């Protein structure tokens, strides 16, 4: 898996240490520190994915500092200041590039989020704290390849995908589609797949349902073809793993009694 790393350094310094107290509560530390960030972008895809040159260009990334779900600061990577003063407390650092969509054929979304607790320094010398964020694609790559012989028996055929991110909607791969799609998935998510066909001979329709486990940065290629005539006419499925790409190829043969 190819990787592209980038970083911008982060220093946590100490400002004035302040304390507040009451008769009912212990003193809570407060103060102001200077932070910087260390971000790692792991944009390599475990499949024959789209051109990743855009995702390796650091100037395309956005960096945010978040506290209690509120975005305090947003920077383009090229405009990121060398240091940032913040109050002591809990924060999130988020870096991302692309549009966060449930499915896309044009792009993929890359994101990293890290929680950090900022504490003020009590010494004369500034303490150094590094906040590391790793950005990765949140999607899996899927492709469907229909055999040329499908058109000899079926007037229409397509594959429907259902994921958690899609909600009540679905993504349909038509018989004329060729470009891969990038589906937003959770780790080890069970993705529902339905193969639908319409016979030329009598216009009857048939469907078969499958489930495949997918995770971000993985690939799935589904090859659909008519099955050679046999006595049972059952659907058979074979799984082949290409270790050079980690693409999972699912060969789905249409049963004899569908033709």
Where are these regions (language model features)?
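Sec-dependent bacterial lipoprotein signal peptides
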Residues: 1-19
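Alpha-helical interaction segments
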Residues: 11, 81-82
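Extracytoplasmic cysteine-anchoring/structural motifs
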Residues: 21-76, 83-259
